[in-house]
Amino acid sequence: MISLESQVLERHLSFFDGKSVLFAGGISDNFPQTLASKCSSIQIWSCYFDYARTQSAVNFSVEFQGQADLIVYYWTKNKQEVNFQLLQLLAQASIGQEILIIGENRCGVRSVEKTLAPYGEIAKIDSARRCGLYHFSLQNKPHFELKNFWRTYQHSTLENLTIYSLPGVFSAAELDTGTELLLSTIDNKIKGKVLDLGCGAGVIGSMIKKRAPNAQITMTDIHAMALESARKTLSENQLQGEVYASDVFSDIEGKFDLIISNPPFHDGIDTAYRTVKELITQAKWHLNQGGELRIVANAFLPYPELLRQYFNDYQVLAQTGKFKVYSVKN
C-alpha cells in the first residue's frame, strides 16, 4: 500500500519518463522502487532510519551529495527539517532544476509556496487525497553551509553542559519540561551500561555521563540529525559515549543496567504508541538481571497498564501535573 502522497504522484507518471530521479524528505513507502523501470536511475535520501532500514539503496544521512534530472520531495510535518533539507538540495542543484513537492495539507504543505518563492517559480499542479502537489523550477540558488544551522543552549538543570542541535531535532532550542523532570531523578549512583533510547540531541545521556563518569553511555535514535547532534553534544562537552542509529531495539546489541528514555508520544500529528509499546514490551530482553527501565511520559497516557503487564509493578519516581517518571526493574 503506497502513501496518499505517492497516490497523487501516480497521477503524474509522465514527469518520470527516462529521467534520473532523487526522492527525498518524508518518504514512507516503496513507491520510488516501483518506478525503477520508468526512470533512468533512482536515488533515495532519508534522514529516518526506521524507513531506511526497511528499503533498498537508501542514503541515510544528514547531508546528501548527488544530482538528478528531477527531485521529488515529500513534505514532512517538521518545518525546520523541511527548510534545512530543501535549502541543501537547492544549493547543490543547477539553475533550472525541476522539483516536485508533495505533502498532506494537514502537515502544512501549503507553506511551500512562501518557502520557495525567493528561489524560483512554483505552482500548484494537483490537489487530491487531501494532498497538494507543487512544481518548482530553480532560478536563484541559496547558500548552504551545515555549520550555519547549529544551535546551542544551556540550562541551570544541565550544570554547564552545552547542548548542540540541528534543525528538526526534538527540543532543539530549549530543555523540555518532560526531560527536565526525568533529569531530576538522575544521580551519581548510576553505574554500568546505560542506553539513552531516542536520544535526540543527547541531553539525557550526556547528563548521566557528567553526573556518573564511570557509566558506559550508548545513545540511539532514528533521526540522522538527532544522532549528529548527540555526537556533537558529547564531543563539545568532552564526554565519551557511543551513538548510532536504531529503530527502538532494531540494532541494539548486548544488555544494559539502565534503559532511559523520553519517548515520543506523538509523531507529528499522530500519537506514536508503536514506539512506546515496543520500548516497554521488549525492554526486558535488553536489560541485565536487576536492570531498570526509566521513562518520562505525559501523565494522561496509559503506560502504567503496559508496565504492569510486562513488569508486574512500577514506581513513580517524580511527577508534575503533566508528566510522570516511571521506573520498573527486570
Curated annotation (Swiss-Prot):
It comes from the Bacteria. One of its GO terms (molecular function) is 16S rRNA (guanine(1207)-N(2))-methyltransferase activity. Keywords: Cytoplasm, Methyltransferase, rRNA processing, S-adenosyl-L-methionine, Transferase. Its EC number is 2.1.1.172. Its main location: cytoplasm. Pfam families: MTS, MTS_N. CDD domains: AdoMet_MTases. It is found in: Cytoplasm. It catalyses: guanosine(1207) in 16S rRNA + S-adenosyl-L-methionine = N(2)-methylguanosine(1207) in 16S rRNA + S-adenosyl-L-homocysteine + H(+). GO terms for cellular component: cytoplasm. SUPFAM superfamilies: S-adenosyl-L-methionine-dependent methyltransferases (SSF53335). It is an enzyme of class 2 (transferase). PANTHER family: RIBOSOMAL RNA SMALL SUBUNIT METHYLTRANSFERASE C. Monomer. Specifically methylates the guanine in position 1207 of 16S rRNA in the 30S particle. Belongs to the methyltransferase superfamily. RsmC family. This is Ribosomal RNA small subunit methyltransferase C. It comes from Haemophilus influenzae (strain PittGG). The gene is rsmC.
